[in-house]
Amino acid sequence: MSLRSFASIALVLFAAAQAAPAQQSIPTIGQLDGAPFASGLVAAPTGGTVAWVLNARGVRNVWTADAAGGQARMITRFTDDEGQDITDLTFSRDSRILYFVRGGGPNRAGEVPNPTSDAAGAEQAVWRVGLDGSTVGRVAEGSQPTPSRTGLAFVRRGQVFWLADSATKQEAVPMFRARGAQGALRWSPDESRLAFSSNRGTHAFVGVYEPAARRITWLAPSTDTDGQAAWSPDGNRVAFIRTPYERHRMLFTPERSGEPWSILVGDARTGKASTAWTAAKGVGSVFREIVSDNQLQWCAGDRIVFPWERDGWPHLYSVSAAGGTASLLTPGDGEVEYVIATPDGRRILYNTNQGDIDRRHVRMVAVDGSAAPVSVTNGDGIEWNPVMTAGGTVVVTRSSARDPAQVARVSGERMVALAPSTIPADFPSAQLVVPRAVTFRAADGIVTHGQLFLPPDYITGARRPAVIFLHGGSRRQMLLGWNYSSYYHHAYAMNQALALRGAVVLQLNYRSGIGYGMAFREAIGYGATGGTEYRDLAAAGRWLAARPDVDPKRIALWGGSYGGYLTAMGLTRDPQLFSAGVDIHGVHDWNVGIATFLPDYNPLEDPAAAALAFKSSPLSTVKSWKAPVLVIHGDDDRNVRFIETQTLVAALRKQGVHVEQLVFPDEIHSFLRHASWQGAYTAALDFFARTIGTRP
């Protein structure tokens, strides 16, 4: 499409949008995406304090509260949208100090994120702050703070360092040195030993370091990948997960079965280990990691709790540390996430979508399976990241269709926000659209879920523009409310902005995403093996086009990462159906995308697979692309290489497609600065107003 013809169409659509019924005080994207995002909730080992990170329009700070009802307080004082993340909140053993990491991790060149292009550079460092708000300060360059009663262990550039007094300016010293990249530090209960993982690239070991003897003991080293160490309560044994090495393991391809993974229990003194449990062959033989600080929980009664999807759903199971048959703890269709043991080690808290497939609620179950799980939260909200204080109070992070993520205390059937004043006065909660769940069937019979947003001034039969949002991942799920991921928290605000500007908006949970079981997640032919998830997008587009309230000539796409891939697929595979797109850091050639995560990937080793990967990519059919597109990318993206967007833009230029660009120097994949999100979404809203006639 020529620039002149595109401009003419845009002018007509803009005029039509201006002639539409006026809607008073449409919230700005600044108001909608100005909702704060709470994350990283943790409970102190003693007392009733909880802590979390609050990102308020790019300004990140640590907050604490007495879970029993005390007033929440901000205990750090960062003031700018600097793009420096705060993660790894960790209490000291006496619960008086909070450690955290400020700044992102390095890329393969060793560069840490510097999204403001600060001439002085940036760093990733461990910080500490007293719970009374005193002694806020940098401790040392590094990450993964792991305090003991006598000092602080942490990781710097793949090695473990030690600081006896984190409150002074003394230099940290290497605790020990080992080949590879060390991480996942875990003190034994008596703090005499430190378990850690040692990643050697093709394999990984679990080691135990004994400071008094200055000795490393490797636990049954093998050619496989070991990790996820969990100490026994007596401090003599370490449980860990072993996943078998496979030479030609590929990414972005379905993996329904493989060589079974196992749980081993090792002697911390001798390094000898025995197998406590091994997955059965077939479904569940491939390890499926869940959202949790540790995949293994060594609990009371010498029971080890772990995730397994033997029946096609990620569930929790329990097995004796001595070995035996595993007991299913969480039966039913649905997935478990954010798993944590209660302080007494007798129960497990987790969130799940069982019984409410497009939301999350918290449940609790006994580690021995002696009783069925009990609901801790329910209703039309979304709850995740549960913790329990030493006094037994349960605290969660929660949201709903109209309320963004906040930390709340569970009080019977109610949830009480701990910091309600953090919601901005101009946040337009009452004006937000409540999405509804929808399903539709693709041409090959696969049923796909989504959430539909109808504009507040909706009139039956009045044809409107429509927009489909495509999440990234692809191991993600959009929900019936504000998402529990910061990336999709922003995306939900954008979808609300589009609906409030007159568009019918559909969030599509296409195959290969989470939430709907293993068979849906590991869909045959998805990704680099055929791109079958595009069938779900095609079905969604035709479903919208057939609706009496949608103008079939004004259906647009937007998405980031994997969602950018599907946006590009739609504009190449169905140019008559989709009329515009916003492609944010999208994958455009699977061979490039795979090599980003597997640097030694060689397409020549399997030419047929490489050819299929390219055939499954938008660039293979780019000559069919006709619609205008806005591409957005940060050039320090570590997940999708910047060259992916460069290659696409070059191809589209050659064939005269109208392309608009927005590039953020030094920004990474999930934008670190609020200004970047605002810039991206402001540009996207303007682009859609000019191409499909949404209100500006």
Positions of the model-derived regions?
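Residue-level detector of Asp-centered blade-edge/turn motifs that repeat once per structural unit
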Residues: 45-46, 93-94, 147-149, 189-190, ...
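Short loop/turn segments that connect beta-strands within beta-propeller blades
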Residues: 66-70, 130-134, 165-168, 210-214, ...
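Bacterial N-terminal signal peptides
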Residues: 7-16
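Serine-hydrolase catalytic core recognition
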Residues: 384-696
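A flexible loop/linker signature enriched in serine peptidases of the S9 family
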Residues: 53-63, 78-85, 101-127, 138-146, ...
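Hydrophobic beta-strand positions that form the internal "hydrophobic ladder"
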Residues: 50, 98, 152, 191-194, ...
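Beta-strand-rich domains and repeat architectures in extracellular enzymes and scaffolds
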Residues: 30-61
